[in-house]
Regions:
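Structural alpha/beta surface segment adjacent to cysteine/selenocysteine redox centers
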Residues: 67, 72-153, 226-235
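A short beta-strand-turn-helix
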Residues: 46-65
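N-terminal targeting signals for export/organelle localization
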Residues: 1-49, 223-242
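Extracellular/periplasmic catalytic domains that process cell-envelope and extracellular macromolecules
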Residues: 59-61, 87-89, 106, 182-185
Length: 242
């Protein structure tokens, strides 16, 4: 019943894929950053109703909010480092956004499973993500069925409860896919202070530092934008999206 429910929801979501290619040249990256800076960024409004990695609601959150755009079949889209950053920084809220791959039909299903588990048990959701993350250098998608059952068993979640919750998460993933079409060129991509940082698989310690840099740029306190451009170009080049 779980697999049938997932397959039905995915049929409605798959036609919405449309990912743009990424240009790693510094001038193009600069143009994209300037585009981001030209628009106001209101994460409380944009992410209303969503959850931080620790299960807290974005609604009413008083600290800094970061978007973490990921594809659960991307070997560089680790959940452990963002989760560690969330735990170590109580004034930080990291929100997962989904940009599934169009190359594999299971990608959307994994996003749906993760969002459903987040509603029922964030710990089970993060364990599921870790279990299905492909090995770096291989990138071969990992089947999710056994990991899903393991997550359900570990959190004592009934099949009926999972299926009932699953039906409400299709809209969440669908909205992410639509937004990603003209916004996200590669994964992982962080959005900090409204600035996209593509192909940046930051460590837990690097995330607050990158946020501080983005905040300085957004507030025009100093001329650090070229430092940010160098970070983005370096990561895009190493990611192989050139």
């Amino acid at each position: 019943m779980l697999l049938r429910s997932l397959a039905f929801l995915c049929l409605a979501l798959l036609p919405q894929f449309a990912h743009a290619s990424s240009e790693p040249l510094a001038e193009n990256v600069m143009a994209e950053v300037m585009k981001d800076l030209s628009a106001p960024y209101t994460p409380q409004e944009k992410l209303a109703g969503k959850m931080c990695l620790n299960g807290a609601s974005v609604d009413g959150f008083q600290g800094d909010i970061i978007e973490y755009w990921a594809n659960l079949e991307c070997p560089y889209c680790d959940i452990k480092e963002p989760l560690a950053a969330q735990r170590d920084n109580p004034n930080l809220c990291i929100v997962v956004r989904h940009s599934p791959s169009a190359s594999y039909g299971e990608s959307v299903k994994k996003s749906l499973v993760y969002e459903t588990l987040m509603q029922l048990s964030p710990n089970a959701a993060h364990q599921f993500w870790s279990d299905i993350l492909p090995e770096k250098g291989k990138g071969v998608p990992v089947p999710y069925e056994a990991s899903l059952q393991k997550a359900l068993d570990s959190a004592a979640i009934s099949t009926d409860s999972f299926v009932a919750t699953l039906k409400n998460q299709a809209e969440t993933v669908s909205k992410d896919i639509v937004e990603a079409q003209n916004l996200i060129s590669t994964t992982p991509t962080y959005i900090m202070e409204g600035i996209r940082l593509p192909a940046c698989d930051f460590t837990a310690k690097e995330i607050p530092s990158a946020l501080a840099l983005a905040k300085r740029i957004r507030s025009h306190k100093d001329d650090t934008i070229h430092e940010l451009i160098e970070i983005i170009v370096k990561n895009i080049t190493e990611d192989g999206t050139v």
